[in-house]
Amino acid sequence: MDIKKYEVLLAVVDKGSFIKAASELGYTQSGITYMMNSLEKECGFPLLQRSNKGVILTLEGERLLPEIRQLVQLNKRLEQDFSEVKGQIAGKVRIGCFPTIVCAVMPRIMRIFRDKYPQIQLDLVEENSVGVLEEWLESGFIDVAFFSRQPRYEYDWFPVKEDRYVVVMSKESPLTAYDVIKPNQLEGQPFFMYRGSDGIDADVASYFKKNKADLMPTFTSSSDYAVLYMIEENLGIGMIPELLTLHSEEKFPTITTRPLDPPAQREIGLAVNHYDTAVPAVQRFVQTVQKSVSNGTLII
């Protein structure tokens, strides 16, 4: 039994594509195809099929998927336990992050973690959809999700930071006359909003719904920076996490921000599916982030 083939199978299923799986794992597409053909030959029946949604599992593949995921996870843990017995901490942690977190936070976290655990590889996967990150965490495609907490979470949660939202605007905007912005002041304004693959920012949408503000985005983009470029030209205003603006002031010198009243904020943290049984490398990553934040080594 070649565990590597099962790891490749999971990547193909999670990505829905041979090409994307090859890119993720560092293989050629032909190499991925060969391994999957070989695995299906060993099994004696097809595991994958093509559909209008990409590559998906056959009924036989779906039946075996839970056991395959468990097998791969147990193998990963066994390899890391071997390393610990030998006095080494090694392995790989795959982290799913919002793009804003990748830009604003992860470089410093990676530096701190690499200095402490040089044998543990960190693999970052960017995704702007809360729903997709949740699915990846549940399926085991990622080990840790680094995003904002939602009421429906069923995972072990480790808070890192309270991150407030601010209204961002050109310095030429009339709204700069106000020290704080009320939600109803944004109604009727050309409004630019960040949009994930499953819709507009869930935290922003929840805030406006709670405060009964009627907001219709004029422009949406899957790139925070695209939104900022539009606002820089005084084409409208937006609402983005303050975490992003702290690292954008030099790049966008003609924009400014204002807080909201009532405040809008989100809790940023790490989500792990069953922390107590997670592999040692995952536990070390969570512990390092929490300790670095609490002792001031990592200031976010």
What do these predicted ranges mean?
Residues 39-40, 113:
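Conserved amphipathic alpha-helical core elements
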Residues 90-152, 221:
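Central regulatory/effector-binding core of bacterial HTH transcription factors
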Residues 154-159, 163-164, 225-274:
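Beta-alpha-beta core module
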